[in-house]
From Swiss-Prot:
Biological function: Might take part in the signal recognition particle (SRP) pathway. This is inferred from the conservation of its genetic proximity to ftsY/ffh. May be a regulatory protein.
Transmembrane segments: none
Taxonomic source organism: Symbiobacterium thermophilum (strain DSM 24528 / JCM 14929 / IAM 14863 / T)
HAMAP family associated with the record: UPF0122 (MF_00245)
Lineage: Bacteria, Bacillati, Bacillota, Clostridia, Eubacteriales
InterPro entries: RNA_pol_sigma_r3/r4-like, UPF0122, UPF0122_fam_protein, WH-like_DNA-bd_sf
Pfam family, one: UPF0122
Family to which the UniProt record says this protein belongs: Belongs to the UPF0122 family.
Name under which the protein is recorded: UPF0122 protein STH1464
Length: 107
């Protein structure tokens, strides 16, 4: 997964755990595609300050995922749903039942 996509996904899950400032910077840089210079100019700080805070925010998001694993679990469930859909499309009921059982085991 590309870094931008990964950070966006982590932000979807863990963004509320960041400070408001961290959320603003991640949103501006990754979701609104502003450059470091644009953000720095708008905030009246150095480009380096913005860069460092974004990197710390990224590290915090990665740390939350490492500890909680919600994104990995979400992706695993999406894969199981894909397997279930494929099995149903093939009319492979035994494979569909296995995928469904795996999903139910999580509930």
């Amino acid at each position: 997964m590309k870094d931008v996509q990964r950070i966006a996904l982590l932000f979807d899950f863990y963004g509320p755990l960041l400070t408001e400032r961290q959320q603003e910077l991640i949103r501006a840089y990754y979701l609104e595609d502003h450059s470091l210079a644009e953000i720095a100019d708008a905030d009246g700080v150095s480009r380096q300050a913005v860069h460092e805070l974004i990197r710390r925010s990224e590290a915090a998001l990665q740390e939350y995922e490492q500890r909680l694993g919600f994104v990995a679990e979400h992706q695993r469930r999406l894969r199981l749903l894909d397997e279930l859909q494929e099995a149903l499309d093939r009319a492979d009921l035994s494979a569909a039942r296995r995928a469904l059982a795996a999903l139910r085991a999580e509930a």
